[in-house]
Amino acid sequence: MLASPPPMSAKTKSKPVSRAALAGEADPRLVALSVSIQDDGALYAEDIRGSQAHVTMLAEQGIVPKASARRIVAALDQVRAEFAAGKIRLDPALEDVHTHVERRLGELVGADAGYLHAGRSRNDQVALDERLFIVAACERCDAALGRLQRALVARAREHEKTILPGYTHLQRAQPVSLAHHLLAHVEAFARDRDRLADVRRRAAVSPLGSGALAGTTLPLDREATAKALGLAGVTQNSLDAVSDRDSAIELLFACALAAVHLSRVGEEIVLWTTKEFGFMTLADAFATGSSLMPQKKNPDVGELARGRAGRAIGDLVALLAIVKSLPLSYNRDMQEDKRPLIGGPDALVLTADAVGGAIETATFHADRMEEALGSGEALATDAAEYLVERGVPFREAHEAVGKAAAFSSAEGRPLAKLTADEWRRFHPAFQKDVLRCFDARKSLARRELTGAPGPRQVARQLARWEKALAKERR
């Protein structure tokens, strides 16, 4: 049997649905505390999309008249357009985006608007809105990280043969190619993208039909609604469905870790653009000046990438703290999840695109990078492995080269400039050909294990990434 809609008039100042059983109006201080439209207003498109799928299903199930459902769907299209155009005046008295949508719908279709909420609670409604938002946010973040990867791979291709010191503890350690270094960041962002795909998969189920916490007696077709929304299935426990914020937390974790990876790139931009390093010059479009010092060219893009990581971590911790120890099922605390959830993905996209633009347009100084290898310390490990190849235990070889490095430092001469006779003072297995260890290009050419910085390995990795990223664009 078709339900009759409750009376609704656009001219009547209606009491909020949540106060139907309460006397009088809410205290203004409670109203001010309860308002969330400044945060959840960003979910208007998801809220409308969910409502359209829900009312269409209600009509197919014979719960509401099909003509009324069609009018509601068409009117919701108009409401969406009005939100997008900024024509909906946000009223704190209406608290949230759901009430704003319903109020405007009532103005457009009158009493038919009362059909919309049949078989649905705010609890499963907002849970759906968030899931739809999370699915789309994962896709936006993934696309931004993909663009950044393409920028890194393109610059790596240009610098296959550029050599620089690799660092540990920010001290020169061993030589690597700039291509290998840039591809290291590509790998980190690939893991971020894998995490986002996992988050999307778990988020893409519909909680509609869970009601406030115990479902509904109405004959809903939950699977049909999920299919209409492009979701993979439905949640399996109504209590869990309305109290679950795992996908939001997982998304913010994925964003936070990606932001940490971006902060590492940002830190390198800051370091490499200093006069002390001189490895890199930012394009003027990605740098700023000083209000006082006219000579300054500041790497703000790198610094902001570092700073945004702190905000991303804070968003994650905030949401974890909000849901900590909450009893089943829904609690109003959860209203506070909107600000970190909605702002986090957008911040990641903005940062990734800015860092990608900086990488695309920067100048890398190959001569300065190779100059930083000149003293030979970065090839000391090769000298130790020279002894290992001649049967010397590694610890013994390590000690011998360490003593040679100390001697080199005391003499004020580069390690690469020691003579074969001087090397033999530290171990008899050193021969004249030990001097070949101090050619950085030959050193890299001997490092061809899978994942190593040898030229053939780097070429393989470049080809692999170029193929994978090109496939995404088709």
UniProtKB/Swiss-Prot annotation:
GO molecular function, one term: argininosuccinate lyase activity
CDD domains in the cross-refs: Argininosuccinate_lyase
Location(s), subcellular: Cytoplasm
PANTHER family named among the record's database cross-references: ARGININOSUCCINATE LYASE
Recorded superkingdom: Bacteria
Name of this chain's protein: Argininosuccinate lyase
Main location: cytoplasm
One of the protein's GO biological processes: L-arginine biosynthetic process
Record keyword Cytoplasm present: yes
A Pfam match: ASL_C2
Keywords carried by this UniProt record: Amino-acid biosynthesis, Arginine biosynthesis, Cytoplasm, Lyase
Pathway: Amino-acid biosynthesis; L-arginine biosynthesis; L-arginine from L-ornithine and carbamoyl phosphate: step 3/3
GO CC terms, sorted: cytosol
Top EC group: lyase
Family to which the UniProt record says this protein belongs: Belongs to the lyase 1 family. Argininosuccinate lyase subfamily.
Annotated catalysed reactions: 2-(N(omega)-L-arginino)succinate = fumarate + L-arginine
E.C. designation(s): 4.3.2.1
PROSITE patterns cross-referenced by the UniProt entry: FUMARATE_LYASES
